[in-house]
């Protein structure tokens, strides 16, 4: 039973006899030959399927593994076009595989365009994901169409030379895809284990060197058959398959799958252990000091600022006095253990499910030919590995909300998202508090005045996003005398969870890179004296304080936090 027989309905007529495993004479309109033999793991064509025939039925006596066929017209549910007879089975398989290939191409293109069109997604980690998408896209566009054509026609129709090139590109793309998954696992472990040092450890130059090495290794693995490390070439050019030479099968399986799989499993286990330990430490810190243990504070020390007697913001400066204001951002912690376990199970489980059967059967069948699976089973296993390239765009990028939003913008033909300055964000949510007897005023300026003390916070507790009623109640409450104005950058959450370290390192990197941009400074730049980022250590009282140049923060955007 072939791959086509599994996915479609059989339309074959009575079979004729054959002494060599090939087909019988194709004289009758409803007579078809049985399946031919297989060379190199590729099955012979099925009678009544896609075959070449130009003479009469009696003239179309086939050689071993080559079915006979009528020259034109219809044969038992088959359609003849230009000398090729394509069965209804082949049409069904072709439609299924075409949808499969288009899905893989579209998904990987979305990943690449999302990063290319959104500057805030252009990070080192996402560069590795883009490399994975490039490998999968190359596989989907340059390899799978020819594999699908061979499944539909039942034979290889592109010649011996192109068969060798196709097989090499197949191994190249699959190996690069698997090694990209391995690189992503190492990158995520480094990002979680050494979050504050991550920008210095994983620079763009190092990432480029890693990707170059990755493709070099994939190239070395793939060129073996082109240099002669393969089985004897079959005489019939209509057969094309992967090389099953024992030495190369073991070498390619170890380098392309078993070593990367070991690294992936170890790295993701370490990620889970570190995330679990960090989550427990942060939860313990919150119990000891509620509201402080998980808080990361970006402080901007400004010159004197005052609030007018009516409660409206003022910009009066006072000599010898410095009013310290802060942008207090309650960033997200690591995922809870259950969510982390679920995500890692999906990542590792799908990878192993897709590739392990193929890389188990390939060396086993090379060493022990009597243990090789049937044609139909091997074809399913073969395409299951290709399926991993189709689901990769769903597993990795779609686990990020930013990627999901970028996908939606691309589907709506909105390539770029307008990025507003941090100081112009959510102006309608701010409030001023004074000691005046009157209620606090809440105008809606789009840009905060120079020297104004700002606070960006996310408060834990029940509830969802702010509503007009809750905003009115907050603005009408009496407060002690202060000059605090608050922007709610993040909505209230049930728990302040997920990815504390990654957010801190990203924010730190954005602040550092601000000084290298040649953009106009924001309105507060002239009033700022110092910028610092305070990060509490896990489960400890000490705080790590990182100072920055006053001008470095000027290009900090809403999307950076």
UniProtKB/Swiss-Prot annotation:
A GO-annotated cellular component: plasma membrane
Superkingdom to which the source organism belongs: Eukaryota
PROSITE patterns in the record: G_PROTEIN_RECEP_F1_1, G_PROTEIN_RECEP_F1_2
Spans within the Cytoplasmic topological domain: 116-127, 187-207, 270-342, 400-561
InterPro entries with a match to the protein in the record: ADR_fam, ADRA1D_rcpt, GPCR_Rhodpsn, GPCR_Rhodpsn_7TM
Positions in the Extracellular compartment: 1-90, 154-163, 233-245, 368-374
Subunit organization: Interacts with FLNA (via filamin repeat 21); increases PKA-mediated phosphorylation of FLNA.
UniProt record similarity statement: Belongs to the G-protein coupled receptor 1 family. Adrenergic receptor subfamily. ADRA1D sub-subfamily.
Full protein name: Alpha-1D adrenergic receptor
Gene that specifies this protein: Adra1d
């Amino acid at each position: 039973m072939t791959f086509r027989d599994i996915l479609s309905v059989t339309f074959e007529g009575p079979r004729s006899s054959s002494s060599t495993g090939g087909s019988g004479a194709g004289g009758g309109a409803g007579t078809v030959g049985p399946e031919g033999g297989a060379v190199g793991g590729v099955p012979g064509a099925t009678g009544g399927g896609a075959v070449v025939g130009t003479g009469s039925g009696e003239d179309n006596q086939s050689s071993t593994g080559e079915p006979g066929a009528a020259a034109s017209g219809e044969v038992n549910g088959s359609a003849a076009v230009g000398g090729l007879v394509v069965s209804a089975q082949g049409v069904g398989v072709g439609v299924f595989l075409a949808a499969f290939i288009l899905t893989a191409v579209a998904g990987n293109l979305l990943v690449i365009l999302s990063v290319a069109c959104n500057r805030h997604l252009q990070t080192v980690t996402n560069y590795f994901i883009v490399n994975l998408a490039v490998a999968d896209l190359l596989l989907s566009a340059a390899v799978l169409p020819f594999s699908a054509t061979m499944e539909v026609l039942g034979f290889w129709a592109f010649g011996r030379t192109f068969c060798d090139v196709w097989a090499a590109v197949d191994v190249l793309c699959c190996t690069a895809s698997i090694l990209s998954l391995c690189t992503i696992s190492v990158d995520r472990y480094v990002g979680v284990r050494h979050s504050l040092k991550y920008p210095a450890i994983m620079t763009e130059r190092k990432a480029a060197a890693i990707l170059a090495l990755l493709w070099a290794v994939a190239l070395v693995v793939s060129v073996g058959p082109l240099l002669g490390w393969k089985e004897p070439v079959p005489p019939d050019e209509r057969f094309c398959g992967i090389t099953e030479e024992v030495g190369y099968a073991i070498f390619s399986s170890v380098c392309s799958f078993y070593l990367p799989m070991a690294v992936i499993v170890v790295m993701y286990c370490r990620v889970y252990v570190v995330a679990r330990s960090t989550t427990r430490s942060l939860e313990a810190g919150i119990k000891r000091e509620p509201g402080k243990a998980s808080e990361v504070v970006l402080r901007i020390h400004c010159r004197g600022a005052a609030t007018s007697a009516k409660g409206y913001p003022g910009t009066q400066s006072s000599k010898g006095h410095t009013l310290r204001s802060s942008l207090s951002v309650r960033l997200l912690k690591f995922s809870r253990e259950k969510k982390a376990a679920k995500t890692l199970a999906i990542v590792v489980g799908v990878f192993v499910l897709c590739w392990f059967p193929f890389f188990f059967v390939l060396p086993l069948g090379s060493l022990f030919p009597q243990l090789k699976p049937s044609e139909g089973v091997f074809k399913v296993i073969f395409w299951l590995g290709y399926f991993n390239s189709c689901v990769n765009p769903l597993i990795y990028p779609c686990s990020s909300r930013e990627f999901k939003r970028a996908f939606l913008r691309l589907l709506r033909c909105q390539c770029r998202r307008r990025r507003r300055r941090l100081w112009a964000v959510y102006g309608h949510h701010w409030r001023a508090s004074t000691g005046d007897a009157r209620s606090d005023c809440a105008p809606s300026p789009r840009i905060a005045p120079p020297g104004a003390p700002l606070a960006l916070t996310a408060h834990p507790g029940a509830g969802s996003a702010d509503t007009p009623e809750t905003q009115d109640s907050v603005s009408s409450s009496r407060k002690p005398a202060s000059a605090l104005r608050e922007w709610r950058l993040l909505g209230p959450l049930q728990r302040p969870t997920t990815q504390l370290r990654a957010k801190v390192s990203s924010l730190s990197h954005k602040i550092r890179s601000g000084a290298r941009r040649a953009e106009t400074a924001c309105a507060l730049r002239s009033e700022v004296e110092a910028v610092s980022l305070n990060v509490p250590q896990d489960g400890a009282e000490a705080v790590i304080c990182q100072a920055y140049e006053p001008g470095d923060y000027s290009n900090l955007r809403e999307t950076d936090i």
